[in-house]
Amino acid sequence: RRLGARDRVALVAYAGASGVVLEPTPGDRKATIEAAIDQLEAGGPTHGAAGIQLAYAKAREGFIPGGINRVLLATDGDFNVGVVGHDALVDLVKRERAHGVALTTLGFGTGNYNERLMEQLADQGDGAYAYIDDLQEARKVLVENLGGTLLTVARDAKVQVEFNPSAVSE
């Protein structure tokens, strides 16, 4: 609801085969965006790599120089069609990151949920990772937190922590 006319939203689905649900659309066309979201359904085999590639292509198509250009991947991470190896998917995200489009992963589901892959993809895509398990968490992540994390303020930041051995034991 906070998107404006200068923002762009595109939606790609990748259950079974990948396809565009919504071409890059100005953010102030909320009814169009909401109608496209309402069409989405979970189910079928997951061709994640093809969906990610198509999402990056749409992000480059709607690229805004100097803007925040990001793919949001909402999935359980159980990619079971096409490129399914973790290393191949991470390499895909690394290559696409060079185009100036970040990747944030939003994890959903239980059972086959692949948290490790979701974290790796977000890390290699210069993005954030969040797990959403209910409506309250969705609101927190998508409305309250995500807006504050879309702007990258540091890359490849490292933190070194040294504990006082007299205060901390193994």
Say what each PLM segment does:
Residues 1-160, 165:
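Exposed acidic/Ser/Thr-rich ligand/metal-binding surfaces
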Residues 167-170:
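Glycine-rich, Lys/Arg-enriched anion-binding loops that position phosphate/diphosphate groups
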